[in-house]
Regions:
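N-terminal secretory signal peptides that target proteins for export/translocation
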Residues: 1-13
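N-terminal, post-signal-peptide metal-ligating segments of extracellular/periplasmic oxidoreductases
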Residues: 31-178, 183-190, 198-200, 279, ...
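Short Pro-Gly-centered flexible turn/kink motifs
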Residues: 114-116, 190-202, 433-443
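Histidine- and aromatic-rich segments of cupredoxin/plastocyanin-like copper-binding domains
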Residues: 150-187, 268-271, 284-523
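A conserved hydrophobic secondary-structure block that centers on an alpha-helix together
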Residues: 190-227
Length: 560
């Protein structure tokens, strides 16, 4: 059997030991300064994950910016300092705290309970840099209130009660840092209840919740963009990839040791001087982070071949067109908090990449480009926004292209024996990830001519990149190289012959016993208003979301 093929049964013990060793190296070895490390993981214990999470400012040690004048510096981001919750107090022990700009992963299982005390220690802001012209709720934005939202989880948006003072996934609460002053009353656009300094959350994960990847971030109307853009975001996993992704060779769950989590964030660092914000111009200091981001910070494409964009692009001057002068500034693009890291793919069966766009406003147009051929490498699509891809075997290519739309460039997979797969594999060469989106893909080296899984040469490599994206008449996002990928897959393949077999764990949500059919235990029907009557059996109510007043373009109404 050739290297790179499936192993024979008699070699199972040796190859399993090698795979175990590779998995231990992947999961536990310390990464070098330029190797991509996994996000720090906080796992539930005995069905509970109980954390203290402190939102605060911190210099980003993994990013160095050299201003036009002055010494190199680490720009200041906002991070979640996290530890397992101590018995008392709102501070983390110094030897137990994690405060990574790149983000952490909260690893949960179905049926778990997530408990978080969220403490606000964020700095006060300059109102001129956060206010929005047409936002009537901006009076308290400069005080930098925050809260927490577990994006994508199917959980209760529960408010506190007399018996239970904790919040569920409830976005209508504002947590203020008392050091920034007391919030003023608002007569219009009151966000919800106010809490000072901290709030306690208890989020119950249903036992029938689908496995997948989700994320958490602030959800304060009017300032969540600023807070996410400055770094406040992390990821959540429920269950394992192996719950819905199996190897096709022997129907074996894909090994969790070969699952890689990539959190994509970006940071605009200004050279100093006047900057155009929503409410008008304001001066910024050299090295200050622009968290009300400007899509025109740098040119969409390099000026010429001499401009190397490895993890960043240089600021440009658009003041002649009414923009800002960002010359000398830099727009950083990070993977797990690092700019242009190295990714070493060592498992012969390849890796599953779980990608999260944790940027505040940036949309990514992603490709994995073979460095030798300069052509995109085929990757298999596994999951989109926490929903595993499970298409019927008879799905046509035309249907898949239509389903992919402008988000995925769907291409034919290399020839596959249908008997090995429960669903139709979907292959892509390009994918657009808008803010908050998550995508899971199967990555392995492939023959450049056929696209089939193959054993790489000694120097096989690829570039994980943003190809540049134009949003119609809207924003233009730049082309930047995000990471260098090296393929070192020279052993026997244990699980994969042609691709991953996707079982579609998310389909169970639609079944009679699924989570979307479950009733909230304490919920009861609200009294009918005058003129309303119950719907007849089999009927559905349609609710229109849109503008309540078409003459006022600053108003957005829900439920009209």
């Amino acid at each position: 059997m050739l290297v790179g093929g499936l192993h024979k049964p008699m070699t199972r013990i040796l190859t399993s030991a090698a795979a175990l060793l590779a998995g231990l190296i992947f999961a536990g070895a310390a990464a070098s300064a330029h190797d991509l490390a996994e996000p720090t993981v906080f796992r539930s214990r005995h069905g509970v994950l109980d954390l203290l999470m402190i939102a605060r400012a911190k210099p980003i040690s993994t990013i160095t910016y050299a201003p036009p004048t002055g010494s190199p510096m680490n720009p200041t981001g906002w991070v979640y300092e996290i530890c397992r919750r101590p018995a008392s107090g709102n501070t983390c022990p110094a030897d137990a705290a994690v405060a990574d700009y790149g983000g952490v992963r909260l690893a949960l299982q179905k049926g778990d309970t997530l408990k978080i005390r969220l403490v606000n220690q964020l700095p006060q802001l300059d109102a001129a840099k956060v206010n929005h012209n047409a936002d009537p709720g901006q009076a308290n934005l400069f005080r930098n209130p925050t809260n927490l939202h577990t994006h994508g989880l199917i959980v209760e948006p529960r408010a506190p009660t007399l018996k239970d003072q904790t919040f569920g996934d409830y976005v209508f609460v504002q947590i203020f840092n008392s050091a920034n002053g007391m919030p003023v009353p608002q007569t219009t656009h009151q966000h919800g209840s106010n809490k000072m300094d901290y709030a306690d959350y208890r989020i119950d994960i249903p036992w029938n919740h689908p496995s997948g990847q989700f994320w958490f971030h602030p959800h304060i109307h009017g300032i969540s963009l600023n807070q996410v853009s400055q770094g406040l975001a992390g990821i959540i996993s429920v269950g394992e990839v192996s719950d819905y992704a199996h190897g096709d060779a022997r129907d074996t769950p894909f090994p969790d040791a070969s699952v890689r989590h990539l959190i994509l964030k970006d940071l605009q660092v200004a050279p100093g001087g006047p900057v155009q914000f929503d409410s008008g111009p304001a001066n910024v200091q050299p090295g200050e982070v622009i968290n009300q981001q400007d899509p025109g910070f740098c040119a969409q494409f390099p000026a010429d071949s001499s401009e190397v964009r490895e993890g960043s692009c240089p600021g440009v001057d658009t003041s002649a067109d009414g923009g800002s002068n960002f010359s000398g500034g830099k727009w950083f693009f990070t993977v797990n908090g690092r700019t242009f890291p190295k990714i070493k793919v060592t498992d012969s069966d390849g890796e599953v990449w779980r990608l999260t766009n944790a940027s505040g406003s940036l949309s990514y147009n992603l490709q994995l480009t073979d460095d030798e051929t300069q052509k995109p490498i085929i990757i298999q699509l596994i999951s989109v926004d926490g929903v595993s891809v499970n298409l019927p075997q008879d799905t046509t290519m035309d249907t898949m292209v239509r389903l992919g739309g402008a988000r995925f460039r769907v291409v034919p997979c290399p020839p596959l024996p249908t008997s090995r797969f429960h669903s139709k594999p979907v292959c892509v060469t390009q994918m657009v990830m808008m803010p908050s989106s998550r995508t899971e893909v199967f990555v392995t080296y492939r023959d450049p001519a056929t696209g089939a899984i193959a054993s790489p040469g000694r120097s096989a490599s690829a570039t994980f990149k943003m190809a540049g994206l134009t949003m119609g008449s809207g924003d233009q996002w730049p082309a930047v190289d995000l990471a260098k990928v090296h393929f070192h897959q020279h052993g026997w393949r244990n699980h994969i012959a042609y691709g991953l077999d996707i079982r579609g764990d998310a389909l169970a949500t639609m079944q009679p016993s699924g989570i979307l059919d479950a009733k909230v235990p304490y919920a009861s029907a609200a009294p009918l208003r005058d003129g309303c009557r119950p719907l007849p059996p089999g009927h559905r109510r349609r609710i229109f979301f849109g503008l309540a007043d078409l003459t006022d373009d600053g108003t957005f109404g829900l439920g009209y």
